[in-house]
């Protein structure tokens, strides 16, 4: 399935020298079928493909475009920074300014280190937890994604609660790496307590997406995040909240502010650079002082804290800190989700939505609640594929996977919301 012969030809050309024709697997449309859409430009709430077709965009470069694409203030900040030089490999005042902003907004972060991506941030946070505690095991949760580092590409495996070992989810990850990672069911407090009862004194840390945006969008049940905090305190393990996706999207203070839980370490992603390649990790001073050059845990990067990303992020936070910014986003998203739900109900299609700030999930199911990876797997993935292509055909861009969250930006207007709801009505009618 392809939108046009031109798109088909471009994908064929890309596949000649790029593995699978893409530089990140989800872009290949394997989750929905068909040929990827090649984008030429973006502005505000819209994307335009190489055929000139416009789409209302709910991917937002996978989250960071909270102000919409090509916001004039961000573009100006990047252009000004570029005129002064692209990268110095040396400190700038802009790194300090952005670090100050992040620490002020997220009080759990006393010291912060910039990286080049969310994967780098989570990878180093794991290394730091191990270095700080002198332990090897890490706990993660099924359905959560923390980047593509070896320690985190791991599933539960049959030996989890007998030998305390996980299994790789990717070829090339040594079994010796995976055995140190324990994968538990999301939102399962008894499993968490059982795991710590058996292996607690071997566990360096726990890492979790506070709102899981990689099994569509699953929120924590009451008490789940606090239960993690409690067992980490009891066993002196490091509690890592991965806010690469939720940070400054769910709320200004991140999901940790919404759920009133204080992690030891937090990881952040490209939103802190307004969408440019950047990440960060930070947290308690005592732990962060274990990072080189202060301590023995090594981390480095030539482009870490690069001036383009720093200055773009500083400019973005001026907008995010405006009164009522997040409330307006949330209200706009509520309109969208209510309209989509009404359209599905009218068509008699089992459908459910969930919202966390400016993030949302769409599920084809009659389940009352989606609280785990297993409940996500029980949704109708084939129905999502049909919905995705129906919406794409009508000019609405959703994530090309039933397992990815959606995002709204401050650029989405009432007209964009109505356009999307109308497209959904037509698509649902087609699916009946």
Swiss-Prot record:
GO terms for molecular function: glutamate-1-semialdehyde 2,1-aminomutase activity; pyridoxal phosphate binding; transaminase activity. Its cofactor is pyridoxal 5'-phosphate. Keywords: Cytoplasm, Isomerase, Porphyrin biosynthesis, Pyridoxal phosphate. It holds the Pfam family Aminotran_3. GO terms for cellular component: cytoplasm. InterPro entries: 4pyrrol_synth_GluAld_NH2Trfase, Aminotrans_3, Aminotrans_3_PPA_site, PyrdxlP-dep_Trfase, PyrdxlP-dep_Trfase_major, PyrdxlP-dep_Trfase_small. It catalyses: (S)-4-amino-5-oxopentanoate = 5-aminolevulinate. The modification N6-(pyridoxal phosphate)lysine is found at residue 270. It is found in: Cytoplasm. Its EC number is 5.4.3.8. Pathway: Porphyrin-containing compound metabolism; protoporphyrin-IX biosynthesis; 5-aminolevulinate from L-glutamyl-tRNA(Glu): step 2/2. SUPFAM superfamilies: PLP-dependent transferases. Coiled coil: none annotated. It is an enzyme of class 5 (isomerase). Its main location: cytoplasm. GO terms for biological process: protoporphyrinogen IX biosynthetic process. Belongs to the class-III pyridoxal-phosphate-dependent aminotransferase family. HemL subfamily. Homodimer. NCBIfam families: hemL (TIGR00713), PRK00062.1 (NF000818). HAMAP family: HemL_aminotrans_3 (MF_00375). This is Glutamate-1-semialdehyde 2,1-aminomutase. It comes from Acinetobacter baumannii (strain SDF). The gene is hemL.
